[in-house]
């Protein structure tokens, strides 16, 4: 009962009033009398006579058209619900007329004019409480008589009724599934009214004080307007009704496309709202719900449904339905379910969505978009060839961000392997031979042709920073006051080349950035933003190259390129794996080797802390006693570490060291003080070979009478101090190394070139001297900084 009263939209107070009224016997008697009066034919005649008199007083002539049953057509309105068309007859409608004529092919025939009358649609309920709409189309009885004798003429009558209802009430009827029922009339007959103004009648003046005076609910038609409308209708009928279309032919049946809706359904999971990177709700729904409206079906027995990947197809023979839908996501066709709602005449299909990775979905999307753009680029490229333009894709950017695509043929074809992490970063590796020959010469020559006035000998490589994410790469060239008109850029699938100069100093800058062959960029999706401080270049990675890239090569075109590795986990792990064993370093160097602690490592900087150890030596007897004490119980030792970093910070910090069997005291002294007054220190350490040390005293590193056993003890002491600083946080640069040859090479090269950041001028400094308390064993850490 609740479902039946749902569409009434009654409030609780109205329901209470109705329930109380129908419980009253007096109200029930009055209600029965009212129903009998309105259904009595005699009372209806009196009602019509009274209406006729009132309309005459207003100057209107009305006629009540009572439809006589003929036959019923079944269809659907707007693809949602059933629709019944009662084809009726009445003598008040004009008779059909015909005129001989010819069709478009010159065949002789008859042009029929079929007058009709329409009544507004009314809603009704079927036995299963489903809604449907009923329309009455009234013709002259002679029209229905001819239709009963001639099948083609009946098709003209049916198409006329369908077109009249669709055009007059602005609805869409399913003409493909029109079916003639065996019944003669659907619902309760309801008369319609024809109104025409009387030509010589004078309407009665309205008295505003009369309580029965109310405004006329209908527009007062004029005789001229009525004649024009009738003529227009007759012309439309004559133009449309004399031909039998394929849709009207009963032998030809065209399937209708039903209405459908696709809904995305997901479920709330509290794990998607955690404070974590991987806890974001997925934009991909869990399942798709497809609702198909099939108003002419009573069950889903004759429906063929097929789902494969992203395609859904539905077919039905009687009634004829056909639907092909491309779903937005690939679905599990074997795990779906379908259910037919008999009340709403809907087929509800629920299928789960295949949960792909978001990155793979982006790759599919970019591949489809790239395929379309490649076709456009090929067409543009053919036009450029006709105009005798180069296919290098070089263009001058005048404050814009549009760059043409450069075709990179035969470039990076000889890549076989990647060089090891131990190699230096200031040369072009041998694994890129084609870059030195064809590809690089083509880029340089084309760039020189576009900028003929630029001196190639005075080109300077600007400083730049590079950052990346899985789908894009950003280059920031740190050059101020760049002339927008001077920018000349070249982009390819594996390289980007830019050349420009400053406004005031006219200093020319040239930067060529190349990538590995499998690291591909989309050449027609490049953005260039120019500001007073820098130039920001945005590159989009190809979908096949999504992810974090390992390295790139940069430099001035025509010169050797340098290697720059991205700070990613894989590169850092390789650097840390290249550690130098402590046994290969001499004890004298271990004594002066500082302890290096890496605090922060990014693309822009590397923050380290240096700790200079102070070693104290003690007698062998004390050493044995302390070793015995430590064998019984382990002690925690504190390590005082001064903050020595690249920022000259004066903060002091200390860290706790894990328990060990060595008692180590570390301090810090200035180099000048240690050179002037070397002080003897003591240290207690166990021999690495397990033997007891000699009884002789250990002296300071500057003492020439130090024995070999003292050196072994010092190395063991220093090794234990390195082990106490949590080996998991140290890399190969923290370990002691032999830096004598690095110091000699650094001292021999005292000539420096300094480039001014204001005007780009170069200043040569020949008397420059400096002192560094440590040396990098691996130059890669310095290059990353």
UniProtKB/Swiss-Prot annotation:
<dbReference type="InterPro" id="IPR041442">
    <property type="entry name" value="PIH1D1/2/3_CS-like"/>
</dbReference>
<keyword id="KW-0963">Cytoplasm</keyword>
<feature type="compositionally biased region" description="Acidic residues">
    <location>
        <begin position="728"/>
        <end position="737"/>
    </location>
</feature>
<comment type="function">
    <text>Required for cytoplasmic pre-assembly of axonemal dyneins, thereby playing a central role in motility in cilia and flagella. Involved in pre-assembly of dynein arm complexes in the cytoplasm before intraflagellar transport loads them for the ciliary compartment.</text>
</comment>
<dbReference type="GO" id="GO:0070286">
    <property type="term" value="P:axonemal dynein complex assembly"/>
</dbReference>
<dbReference type="InterPro" id="IPR008978">
    <property type="entry name" value="HSP20-like_chaperone"/>
</dbReference>
<dbReference type="GO" id="GO:0060285">
    <property type="term" value="P:cilium-dependent cell motility"/>
</dbReference>
<dbReference type="Pfam" id="PF18201">
    <property type="entry name" value="PIH1_CS"/>
</dbReference>
<comment type="similarity">
    <text>Belongs to the PIH1 family. Kintoun subfamily.</text>
</comment>
<dbReference type="GO" id="GO:0005737">
    <property type="term" value="C:cytoplasm"/>
</dbReference>
<dbReference type="InterPro" id="IPR034727">
    <property type="entry name" value="Kintoun"/>
</dbReference>
<feature type="compositionally biased region" description="Basic and acidic residues">
    <location>
        <begin position="622"/>
        <end position="638"/>
    </location>
</feature>
<dbReference type="GO" id="GO:0120293">
    <property type="term" value="C:dynein axonemal particle"/>
</dbReference>
<feature type="compositionally biased region" description="Basic and acidic residues">
    <location>
        <begin position="662"/>
        <end position="679"/>
    </location>
</feature>
<feature type="region of interest" description="Disordered">
    <location>
        <begin position="719"/>
        <end position="749"/>
    </location>
</feature>
<dbReference type="Pfam" id="PF08190">
    <property type="entry name" value="PIH1"/>
</dbReference>
<protein>
    <recommendedName>
        <fullName>Protein kintoun</fullName>
    </recommendedName>
</protein>
<dbReference type="InterPro" id="IPR012981">
    <property type="entry name" value="PIH1_N"/>
</dbReference>
<feature type="region of interest" description="Disordered">
    <location>
        <begin position="622"/>
        <end position="698"/>
    </location>
</feature>
<feature type="compositionally biased region" description="Polar residues">
    <location>
        <begin position="681"/>
        <end position="695"/>
    </location>
</feature>
<dbReference type="InterPro" id="IPR050734">
    <property type="entry name" value="PIH1/Kintoun_subfamily"/>
</dbReference>
